[in-house]
């Protein structure tokens, strides 16, 4: 994989200064990927891509502009730089815009093991074999497994190089592998789709393809025979995927842009209790091999591990330099950007610290309630914290999973929901960059028939 070297990035920065820029930064991303999909054993997708792009952010005083290009010859780049400088000169000034304080740039970068040393891009034949194996395992698991939305395997590798006119330069490389399968179970006229996936930076650490297929089949089968329920208030047990979505919503309200726009229910809540005392939510960019790990953020600032919520208390907001300046706070190393866009705010590896309960113990504590396994639509108002989602899952009776339910809506308010977290599971599993164990909320409205 041909990558961009630091010499070219520095030449672009020098050219920007020669053309009149007061400050500049360069982001170069080189990526290669292969995706292979099958449906009912037949090839449905086979796509390979290679790309090198350079993004340039130019400042002319407090005015700025961003451009990107895939033409990396110096003659083309010289014209590209000149055009971006002119765009910055013509843009409106913004008093909050600018590069970070140079003193904040790291002197050294951590080694985070983001690239698989043993595997690169998986071959097309191997990728198709893996996808077929997963789908076949799902369809063979039970006679009621009648159809499939398909299975897909993806592999990729990339290099990120960042440099700015303050003298900071850094780079890192990574790999990623994922497999997803979506089989369909049928019993009479009733059909239900299952879904399961595995992802990792190391090919050898992926869940076995047959196991992924079987899990997806089980999840489809357990949805057959779904019933409707009456409207009531009852406990809800969030499975790990649903719990991860919940904490993503909560932490999204702690994002700088939402805060300075006044569009978050967490405005003014820093240092205050927003959840039960057992709730600690961590954003950790430094987990070796983590799917969201990176040694520096999208503005060249050091990343870190930090408790966003610490024993129920909102301990920090997540900020890039722009939102930090507007809020009068320090940036947190959570800037993220693509080659053609301005920095935004993003989490890295976000997780809810696990508790001591097994999922069986949590379910066993519920006399009557919902084990939540799916939600539909967005339905979260970040300004008020109001939460209302179409949902499905398995009804709990006397501490046991009794029967599937669907066509229901669950509703509450995020602050009330987080304050009502009663039990947290010990089943944290790193399958994505945002994860959580099983958790139980004391009571929510469940609207049924």
Feature locations, PLM:
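N-terminal small-residue-enriched
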Residues: 1-449
């Amino acid at each position: 994989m041909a990558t961009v070297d630091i010499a070219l990035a520095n030449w672009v920065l020098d050219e920007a200064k020669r053309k009149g820029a007061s400050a500049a930064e360069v982001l170069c991303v080189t990526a290669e990927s292969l995706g292979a999909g099958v449906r009912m054993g037949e090839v449905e997708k086979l796509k390979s891509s290679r790309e090198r792009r350079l993004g340039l952010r130019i400042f002319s005083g407090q005015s700025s502009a961003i451009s990107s290009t895939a033409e990396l010859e110096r003659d083309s780049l010289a014209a590209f730089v000149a055009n971006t400088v002119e765009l910055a000169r013509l843009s409106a000034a913004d008093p909050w815009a600018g590069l970070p304080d140079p003193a904040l740039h790291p002197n050294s970068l951590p080694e985070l093991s983001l690239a698989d040393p043993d595997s690169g891009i998986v071959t097309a034949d191997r990728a198709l074999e893996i996808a077929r194996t997963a789908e076949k395992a799902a369809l063979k698991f039970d006679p009621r497994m009648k159809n499939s939305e398909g299975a897909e395997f993806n592999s990729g590798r990339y290099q990120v190089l960042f440099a700015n006119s303050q003298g900071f330069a850094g780079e890192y490389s990574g790999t990623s592998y994922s497999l997803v399968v979506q089989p369909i179970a049928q019993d009479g006229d009733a059909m239900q789709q299952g879904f399961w996936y595995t992802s990792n930076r190391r090919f050898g650490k992926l869940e076995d393809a047959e196991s992924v297929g079987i899990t997806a089949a089980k999840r489809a089968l357990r949805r057959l025979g779904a019933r409707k329920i009456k409207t009531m208030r009852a406990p809800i047990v969030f499975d790990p995927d649903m719990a991860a979505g919940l904490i993503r919503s909560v932490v999204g309200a702690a994002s700088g842009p939402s805060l300075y726009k006044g569009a978050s229910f967490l405005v003014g809540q820093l240092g205050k209790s927003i959840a039960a005392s057992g709730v600690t939510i961590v954003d950790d960019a430094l987990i070796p091999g983590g799917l969201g790990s990176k040694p520096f953020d999208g503005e060249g600032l050091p990343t870190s591990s930090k408790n966003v919520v610490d024993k129920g208390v909102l301990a920090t907001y997540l900020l890039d330099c722009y939102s930090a300046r507007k809020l009068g706070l320090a940036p947190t190393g959570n800037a993220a950007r693509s080659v053609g866009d301005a920095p935004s705010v993003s989490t890295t590896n976000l997780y809810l610290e696990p508790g001591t309960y097994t999922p069986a113990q949590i379910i066993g504590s519920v006399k009557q309630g919902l084990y939540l396994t799916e939600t539909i639509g967005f339905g979260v108002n970040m300004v008020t914290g109001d939460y209302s989602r179409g949902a499905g899952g398995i009804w709990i009776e006397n501490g046991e999973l009794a029967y599937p339910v669907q066509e229901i809506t669950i509703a509450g308010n995020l602050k009330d929901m987080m304050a009502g977290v009663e039990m947290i599971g010990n089943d944290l599993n790193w399958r994505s960059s945002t994860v959580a164990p099983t958790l139980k909320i004391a009571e929510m409205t469940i609207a049924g028939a």
